[in-house]
């Protein structure tokens, strides 16, 4: 089955039709040598077992063998999840603990994803861009190169309410902490969005906007560039 993940309705269909998963980890002390571990990843030494698999399969084993189990601990971090997390092993970027990045996301070279950041399906993070702590990039949100998305800022997605046009943040844009970029908005190259702003209309290149709703307050000048410059050392 193929899906056009540039269409919000197709993304919703993909999520609807995806096999939902409730994976768990079980740490068990007991006599389970006669159990059927088909479809379960098992590691054991003697009576100590570590099991990885779907909850309904592992829980059946635990219930059927409860008289043979001395101790059991279960860890779970999701329920009926439709989209797996991104495989980050081969990505050349700095991704800190606690960042949540769903599958089918593009992460550019030398970008930085900080603790607590959330990046949804179909989003694109450009080369050298930083997504700061607790910032959110919604479905199909597009961040260009050398963007700084401040702590707690939100780039809205296309899913709910559905929008055919994703948010587009062009190169060298700085978005301050807790700013909100609404659905389908485009921020032009080199512009600055002040902290706490709510951006409801497109922003041209090389301007500073502030307020709720955000309005242009000036053009980017030398002083603005000095106050908003990025640190290359954070991206190495």
Curated annotation (Swiss-Prot):
Pathway: Amino-acid biosynthesis; L-lysine biosynthesis via DAP pathway; LL-2,6-diaminopimelate from (S)-tetrahydrodipicolinate (acetylase route): step 1/3. This is 2,3,4,5-tetrahydropyridine-2,6-dicarboxylate N-acetyltransferase. InterPro entries: DapH, DapH_N, Hexapep, Hexapep_transf_CS, Trans_hexapeptide_repeat, Trimer_LpxA-like_sf. Pfam families: DapH_N, Hexapep_2. It comes from Clostridium botulinum (strain Loch Maree / Type A3). One of its GO terms (biological process) is lysine biosynthetic process via diaminopimelate. PROSITE patterns: HEXAPEP_TRANSFERASES. Keywords: Acyltransferase, Amino-acid biosynthesis, Diaminopimelate biosynthesis, Lysine biosynthesis, Repeat, Transferase.
